[in-house]
Regions:
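Helix-coil-helix junctions within alpha-helical repeat/solenoid scaffolds
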Residues: 1-239
Length: 240
């Protein structure tokens, strides 16, 4: 999932679920439900979660964080941002035990930050940034450093900072080097939105195209849909 080979991840998880001796291990189908949610199949994610009674009843922080992060991405797939933010932050509530850079918090933080920004919830965005800023040196995964740079650049763009284009471009470069293809695609679309707003259509369309290619390769319908919402603006540069 981190490398962006979601087809291989799907195949490996499916084989594991069908393997003798692993059928009762609920963490495996839960990860499969997580992948379904990432791809936009909220129904499959919901069905998977409903079939995990032991995991849902567990008081283990790692189990609770896993359930919460799947619920967060499933809510995002259903276009329920308030619920997505709530569940993502529920995952982050276990940072003290699990560490901010463990799997679930490492994926939950970017979703929470993105959703808070999109909702205009500046208080939540500030609290999420503070969570990373307060981490001791060496505890923050490079991916999270890149995601923190992105949300700061998005906030600067929202506030009309004249240097926002530069900081957004730098943030995308950081994502390209340090994060996942999924998160890079979202960052490219963030950057393209700002570029379109400021009239740099050519650069925006290049970013949209790259994000769309990543989305198609991942089989990530929410990303495909997001890229396509920006497509009509291309008519402004289409030759007549």
């Amino acid at each position: 999932m981190l490398l962006g080979d979601w087809a291989a991840a799907d195949e490996a998880l499916t084989q594991a679920m069908d393997s003798e001796g692993l059928t009762d291990i609920e963490i495996i189908p839960c990860y499969h439900g997580w992948l379904a949610a990432l791809r936009g199949d909220a129904g499959a994610a919901k069905s998977t979660l409903a079939a995990l009674p032991k995991l849902r009843a567990s008081e283990d922080p790692s189990d609770k964080a896993l359930i919460s992060v799947v619920e967060a991405f499933a809510a995002a797939a259903r276009h329920h941002p308030e619920s997505a933010l709530r569940h993502a932050r529920a995952t982050l509530a276990h940072v003290g035990t699990l560490g901010i850079s463990s799997d679930c918090p490492r994926w939950a933080w970017p979703l929470a930050a993105r959703t808070a920004h999109d909702l205009g919830d500046t208080a939540a965005a500030g609290e999420l940034l503070a969570l990373l800023d307060d981490c001791p040196p060496g505890h923050l995964a490079p991916m999270l450093k890149a995601e923190r740079d992105l949300i700061r650049a998005r906030l600067a763009a929202r506030d009309g900072d004249p240097g926002a284009a530069t900081t957004l471009a730098a943030a995308v470069s950081g994502l390209r080097e340090l994060s996942t293809p999924y998160h890079l695609a979202h960052g490219l679309l963030d950057h393209s939105t700002h570029l379109l707003r400021t009239g740099d259509d050519q650069a925006a369309h290049a970013a949209i195209s790259e994000a769309g290619i990543i989305a198609q390769r991942l089989g990530c319908q929410p990303l495909v849909d997001r890229a396509e919402t920006l497509q009509p603006t291309r008519s402004r540069t289409t030759p007549t």
